[in-house]
Amino acid sequence: MVPFLHKKHLSSAQIILAGFAAVILLGAWLLMLPISSRSGTWTPFLDTLFTSTSAVCVTGLVLYDTATHWTLFGQIVILTLIQIGGMGVITVAASIAMLSGRKITLSQRSTMQDAISAPQVGGIVRFTGFILKGILLVELTGAALLSIVFIRDYGFPRGLWMGIFHSVSAFCNAGFDLLGEKVPFSSLTAYVTNPIVNLTIGHLIILGGLGFLTWEDVCRNKWHFQKYRMQSKVILVSTALLITIPALYFFFFEFNDLPFAVRAWGSWFQSVTPRTAGFNTLDYADMSEVGQFITSALMVIGGAPGSTAGGMKNTTFAVLIACAVAVFQKRKDGHYFGRRLSTDTVKDAVAIFLLYMATFLLGGMIISRVENLPLITCFFESASAVGTVGLTLGITTSLGTVSKIVLITEMFFGRVGGLTLIFATIPAAKNLLSRLPEEKIAVG
C-alpha cells in the first residue's frame, strides 16, 4: 500500500490518524502555492490548512469563495482532497494497492476493516472493490444529471466541470461549491426550486451518508427489508425520520413568507443537508433560533458509520434512544428489530456522545468568548465543524486565528472519529482477569 501502513508498531487508529494528517498537510502546501490562487500570490498557511482540513474532513466551511479565489489547479486539488476524505485515506491507499496488483497483508486488511467499520476482515478486499465500483457509478450518474443544468447555464466545458465537482462534493458530503462567481458564498440558493439540482444533490448526500455496508446489504437482499442486518435497518429508518420530521417542521414553522414551491423544496433540502453535506438553498440566518438549534442537533448526529458523512453517527443516537426506552419500560436491554444491543455497543455510544457533546459545547463557548459573538451563532458554527457539515450563519470568513484553530481541530476530530482519536493517543488499559466488586449508586 503506502509506506506508513507498513509500520507494524502503529495501531490501526494511529495509522488512520497519521494518514488523514499527512493528506491534510500535503493539501495545505499545494493550496499555498501561487498557482492555486487566482491572484497568483501565496495564500497564508493557516488559511490553506483550514481549507485543506475542511476538504479532507469533507466539511465545507471556507474562508475564501471556492469559485473566485482558487484557480482550476486549486479547485482540482480541493476536489481530490474531498474524494480522498470521502472515501477515507486507508480505502484510497488500499484501492491503489489493489489496482497496482500488490498483495495486501493481513495486518493491512485489519486496518482497512477498522477504517470502513466492516464487521469482519474476511472479504474486505472484495468489499473495497464493491465500494470503488459503487462510488464511480453514483458519482458519474450525479455528474451527468447536474451537467444538464450547469452546461445550460455556464456552457461547455465549464458546465461539465461544475457537474463533476458538485457531484463528488455532494456524494462525499463535503458542501464545497463553484457557484459564487455571481454572488460569493451563495451555495445553491439560485437553484432552490430546480428539481434536477435539488433531487440529484439531495440523493447524492443521502446515498453517501447511508454507508457502504448498508449499500452492500441492500444490493444483496434487494427489497427484502426483514433480511437486512439490524444496523442497516436502524440506519435506513433513522435516516428517513431525521429527514422527514425536520422537513415538516421547517415547512410549517420556518420560511413562512416564501412562496409554496420555494418553501416545499427548501424545507426538504434544508433537512437533508445537515446530514453533514453543507450545501444550502435557503439562508439559515433567516431561520428562527429554534430552527437553528434543530439544525445544530442534526449536524452533530450526522450520518451512518462507514459512510462519507461525519458526526457522532445516527446509529449512536439510535442506541441512546433504545437504551432510554428500555429504562422507561423497565427492561434490562435496549433492542431493535428483535435483536438485543450488546453492552459494549451501549458503552461505546455513551462515550462517543459525551466526546462529541463536550467538543461541540467547548468549541462554541471558546469561539463566542474570543469573537464576542452570540452563543447560538457560535454553537451553530461549532456543530457544523464537529459534524463535518459546512453550514454557517456567515461568521466563518471573519474569524480570528484562535477560532480557526478551534474549527480545524473540530473538523479533524469529527472526521476521524472521537474513539479513533482516543485510541490513537491514549494507551489501552490492561485487561484484568478478575473484576472489581459491584455496587449501585443512585442516579436521576
Please provide the spans of the model-predicted regions:
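Membrane-proximal intracellular helices of multi-pass ion channels
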Residues: 1-444
